[in-house]
Amino acid sequence: MLQTKDLIWTLFFLGTAVSLQVDIVPSQGEISVGESKFFLCQVAGDAKDKDISWFSPNGEKLTPNQQRISVVWNDDSSSTLTIYNANIDDAGIYKCVVTGEDGSESEATVNVKIFQKLMFKNAPTPQEFREGEDAVIVCDVVSSLPPTIIWKHKGRDVILKKDVRFIVLSNNYLQIRGIKKTDEGTYRCEGRILARGEINFKDIQVIVNVPPTIQARQNIVNATANLGQSVTLVCDAEGFPEPTMSWTKDGEQIEQEEDDEKYIFSDDSSQLTIKKVDKNDEAEYICIAENKAGEQDATIHLKVFAKPKITYVENQTAMELEEQVTLTCEASGDPIPSITWRTSTRNISSEEKASWTRPEKQETLDGHMVVRSHARVSSLTLKSIQYTDAGEYICTASNTIGQDSQSMYLEVQYAPKLQGPVAVYTWEGNQVNITCEVFAYPSATISWFRDGQLLPSSNYSNIKIYNTPSASYLEVTPDSENDFGNYNCTAVNRIGQESLEFILVQADTPSSPSIDQVEPYSSTAQVQFDEPEATGGVPILKYKAEWRAVGEEVWHSKWYDAKEASMEGIVTIVGLKPETTYAVRLAALNGKGLGEISAASEFKTQPVQGEPSAPKLEGQMGEDGNSIKVNLIKQDDGGSPIRHYLVRYRALSSEWKPEIRLPSGSDHVMLKSLDWNAEYEVYVVAENQQGKSKAAHFVFRTSAQPTAIPANGSPTSGLSTGAIVGILIVIFVLLLVVVDITCYFLNKCGLFMCIAVNLCGKAGPGAKGKDMEEGKAAFSKDESKEPIVEVRTEEERTPNHDGGKHTEPNETTPLTEPEKGPVEAKPECQETETKPAPAEVKTVPNDATQTKENESKA
């Protein structure tokens, strides 16, 4: 019965609802957490004054104008339900109920499902880790359904890498054991929900920070103090991120301030420069590198060395024969300097020691000096003080950095000490000084006495006294025998006095030298001798050699300087004839006069040997640096006069220059315009009628070429060298033309005359009957057809030594050899050829031919 009743009511309501139809659009809805959605409830029917209401899943009626779940009545036939920022609790069936004015109701429902969308709740980027630690990459995913998490790196699943260091934890975090710098990069955390086909991912940047490593380039740095130098300490640091650098000195931070003149940092602070290093900068410096991953430091020891410096010396004063005196020297420096002692004449510290107690005491062999050293202090003790100990003492402090020296002075007071030659020689009328040297401190007063009488006096008018700080000179001019004898020099100071007797002795002439040996040659002889046994009290000034041929009455003589002759004990006499017996004797000359003459010693000169000896060569460089004067010192001529010298020279490894022929009287040859900075060799041969000597050899080097400095910097000032040379050549040619024309008209000779004779048929100068002496070069018809030349010299020729009737070389002596081939004469155009040589060469008349012929026959 009850079921029937319910069915009746249902049919009633259905019949009524036909007129009120309720629809909700959309009919169902899914909302992701946090999203918003609205639903429209629409009523269809004729009912008026309808009431539309919304009910929550828990049956509560929803009121309008709420903030999160809002109900808005649009018009009589619709109403909107809006859910803002949905959450899980908002899920359920929402009902829209429409009530008519007759109380009838119609409703519609919508099932609202709220789900959590796949989202990343905690997956920060970047995530940083320290190299070497176990890194865990965080990625928290929220979703309604449990998601599947996949980790990817460089597009590949990290699990597929088969690297045991990569592990996905139970909370879906990715763990990398012992993470490396190479593991750095982008990692993708990817979530998937199979039921919804939903996928989402998050790229996480993984940064691996590397702890800094730091190393000092030099763990120990040495510097020298007080030289104004700078020193730079350098540390090399690596790490990621790039580490910042800082420095400490003995544990205290070094800060660079503005206008800091002591410390300078590089841009990255890896270098610390310390300016004007001094001893206070010696310390332990630490460079510190720091970044996110940690910090590390390195230590540098700065060792500052100092040059030695003498810090204390003191002058001392002592009395002669005092027991001892000590000189002290103190020095600073690092390393600790060693201190040595010396004077101007001796190195005390390097002398052999009688005893040496290291390191305190060193004693000289004579026990007179003792050196004691300890650390930076050294002392020099002198025992039994002598006046010769006075003077400068130099203390030198040395270490590996350098050295320093200071002088101190020891003043020794002592009574006068006199010195000087006791015996002084002179002769009547010859002025002489008697020297009395005085050593005294304090200075002494010097007096001269003669027979107890103070000098000078009225009785001795020929005496004068001259005093200097170190000596007194008694000038005596003896008038008679009475002026010779004893003279007394007395010196007095506050310490004591001293006297010294001098004897003025009358000098005598020297005894005779003794001839040991005579070494004869064909034209010279060397006399070896011993000096006189008695000089007469005064130095020998000269030696006199006398010689003559046996049977002659007249002695030839020559004076020789005593210093030069005494060096080898030899004098050389020249101008002798070959195969002739001579007697020679010697005498010595001093200020008093010529002494006894020695006994004569006979010798016989040798026959003519033929070739002369090679000359001795000495060079003297010119001021210009590329010229030289070679002096020719004549030696033995072999018994025949030297005709000429032949000179050849060249730069080493170069060709020989043309031979130069010098007359026999020449004593030098000038070589000019030589190559700069080149080594030259010179050969000189002497030639007489018997032949040539061996070559004398001389080697020299020219100077380096000086840098030319123009007199005027203007390039256009003055004429160039080429222009000047050109002008001179033009002038010279014009002069030659003028001279030739003059010769043509006045003497009927010259170039124009030759042209006139050969081309124009004019009669030459020979047509006028002039002989050979007036216009032609002389030729020797029977021997040589070369022109005879003369050599002008300033020296006289030496006499012939062979005793024959040889004609001596004179101004007409020919220098050409008769054995050479003839030269054809060109009388039409006779010209003189001049070759560059120190001697002047010219043609001479033919009458000189006979002289050459006679000389050749000799």
Curated annotation (Swiss-Prot):
The gene is NCAM1. Residues 768-809, 817-834 have a biased composition (Basic and acidic residues). Residues 740-858 are cytoplasmic. The keyword Disulfide bond applies. Disulfide bonds join 41-96, 139-189, 235-287, 329-395, 436-489. Changing residue 433 to Q: Loss of polysialic acid addition by ST8SIA4. Loss of polysialic acid addition by ST8SIA2. Significantly decreases polysialic acid addition by ST8SIA2. Decreases polysialic acid addition by ST8SIA2. The modification Phosphoserine is found at residues 780, 784. GO terms for cellular component: cell surface; collagen-containing extracellular matrix; cytosol; external side of plasma membrane; extracellular region; Golgi membrane; membrane; neuron projection. It comes from Homo sapiens. The chain crosses the membrane at residues 719-739. Polysialylated at Asn-459 and Asn-488 by ST8SIA2 and ST8SIA4. Polysialylation modulates cell interactions by confering both attractive and repulsive properties that are highly regulated by ST8SIA2 and ST8SIA4. Polysialylation is formed on a-2,3-linked sialic acid of core glycans. Residues 20-718 are extracellular. This is Neural cell adhesion molecule 1. (Microbial infection) Interacts with rabies virus glycoprotein. This protein is a cell adhesion molecule involved in neuron-neuron adhesion, neurite fasciculation, outgrowth of neurites, etc. (Microbial infection) Acts as a receptor for rabies virus. Residues 20-111, 116-205, 212-301, 308-413, 416-501 form the Ig-like C2-type domain. Keywords: Cell adhesion, Cell membrane, Disulfide bond, Glycoprotein, GPI-anchor, Host cell receptor for virus entry, Host-virus interaction, Immunoglobulin domain, Lipoprotein, Membrane, Phosphoprotein, Receptor, Repeat, Secreted, Signal, Transmembrane, Transmembrane helix. The lineage of its organism: Eukaryota, Metazoa, Chordata, Craniata, Vertebrata. Glycans are attached at residues 222, 315, 347, 433, 459, 488. Residues 509-608, 611-706 form the Fibronectin type-III domain. Residues 766-858 are annotated as: Disordered. One of its GO terms (biological process) is commissural neuron axon guidance.
